[in-house]
């Protein structure tokens, strides 16, 4: 019955990404969390990313499926090919809908696009490493990258 509604296995997997993976752990979820840095008038981008990493650490199986689909998505015939090709732009556009508290030295959110891209790239790499042996702690590993991507002293009061 489910396949009749969805069509095929690839469409089911696509729905898992678009309707589940992308639907949770969002900036809105962070804003509603009340955690430090989640002020809707200016959220902390590094704090949001820590929230996202912690959230992703709780859904390892889904994250693993996402990584497999992302790899398969290199094929132009894959149903998620266009999605993964556009993902950096989609993430940028989505994050740009929110107010972020960014250090003046950075020049505001409009100058954050390369940093957002680097964060996505670093997270992809850390998540791949997280799936391998010996085990690492996803969150602790992200914190090491955070210090490099959001250096002191510029980001000290914006974490």
What is each of the regions a protein language model found here?
Residues 80-85, 102-159:
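Hydrophobic/aromatic-rich alpha-helical bundle segments in the mid-to-C-terminal region
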Residues 9, 16, 20, 24, ...:
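Hydrophobic/aromatic residues within well-ordered alpha-helical segments
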Residues 6, 58, 68-76:
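Short helix-capping/turn signature of helix-turn-helix
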Residues 40-43, 57-61, 77-103:
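Amphipathic alpha-helical packing segments from all-alpha helical-bundle domains
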Residues 15, 19, 26-63, 115-119:
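Hydrophobic alpha-helical connector segments
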């Amino acid at each position: 019955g489910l396949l009749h509604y969805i069509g095929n296995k690839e469409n089911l997997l696509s729905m898992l990404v678009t309707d589940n993976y992308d639907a949770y752990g969002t900036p809105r979820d962070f804003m509603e969390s009340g955690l430090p840095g989640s002020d809707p008038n200016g959220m902390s981008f590094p704090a949001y990313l820590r929230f996202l990493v912690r959230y992703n650490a709780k859904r390892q199986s889904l994250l693993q499926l996402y990584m497999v689909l992302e790899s398969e998505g290199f094929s132009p015939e894959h149903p998620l090919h266009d999605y993964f090709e556009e993902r950096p732009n989609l993430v940028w556009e989505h994050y740009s809908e929110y107010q972020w508290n960014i250090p003046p030295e950075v020049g505001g959110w409009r100058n954050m696009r390369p940093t957002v891209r680097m964060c996505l790239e670093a997270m992809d790499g850390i998540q791949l490493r997280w799936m391998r042996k010996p085990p690492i702690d996803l969150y602790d590993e992200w914190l090491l990258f955070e210090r490099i991507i959001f250096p002191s002293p510029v980001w000290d009061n914006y974490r």
